[in-house]
C-alpha cells in the first residue's frame, strides 16, 4: 500500500513537472550586441541571446531592433528552439537605420513570456 502511494506521488510530481517545464525556462535575455556599419545608414547586427529553451513549447523565437519610440525597425526570426546551444548568436545583415536615430534597443522575445528579459541599448553616434 505504501509503495503504491509513493509510486503515485512520484508519478504525479513527474507529470506536474513536465507540464510546467515551460515556465522554468524564464524570459529571453539579450546578452551581447555587435554592430558593424556597412555604409551610410546600413548596419549588420550580431545578437547573442540567452534563454533556457525547452523545445517547441517554450523557446526564444525572435529578437528585435527597436527605436526610442518603441517602433520595431527590424526583426530576426529564430526558426527553431536552441535547446543544446546556450547562449546562441544570430546575425541580421543590411539593416537600414534612419539617420536621425542615434540610439536603439535590441530585445528578445520568447513563445511563453513574450518580452521582459534583459535588453541591450546601442549607441549609433559616430558609426555613420
Question: What is each residue range found by the language model?
Answer:
Residues 26-61:
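Short, surface-exposed binding/anchoring microloops in extracellular/periplasmic proteins
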Residues 118-128:
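Short beta-strand elements
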Amino acid at each position: 500500500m505504501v509503495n503504491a502511494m509513493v509510486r503515485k506521488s512520484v508519478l504525479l510530481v513527474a507529470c506536474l513537472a513536465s507540464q510546467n517545464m515551460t515556465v522554468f525556462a524564464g524570459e529571453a535575455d539579450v546578452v551581447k550586441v555587435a554592430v558593424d556599419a556597412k555604409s551610410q545608414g546600413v548596419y549588420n547586427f550580431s545578437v547573442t541571446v540567452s534563454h533556457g529553451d525547452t523545445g517547441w513549447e517554450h523557446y526564444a523565437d525572435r529578437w528585435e531592433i527597436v527605436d526610442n519610440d518603441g517602433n520595431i525597425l527590424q526583426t530576426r526570426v529564430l526558426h527553431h528552439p536552441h535547446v543544446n546551444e546556450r547562449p546562441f548568436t544570430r546575425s541580421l545583415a543590411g539593416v537600414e537605420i534612419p539617420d536621425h536615430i542615434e540610439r536603439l534597443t535590441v530585445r528578445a522575445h520568447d513563445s511563453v513570456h513574450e518580452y521582459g528579459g534583459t535588453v541591450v541599448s546601442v549607441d549609433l553616434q559616430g558609426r555613420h
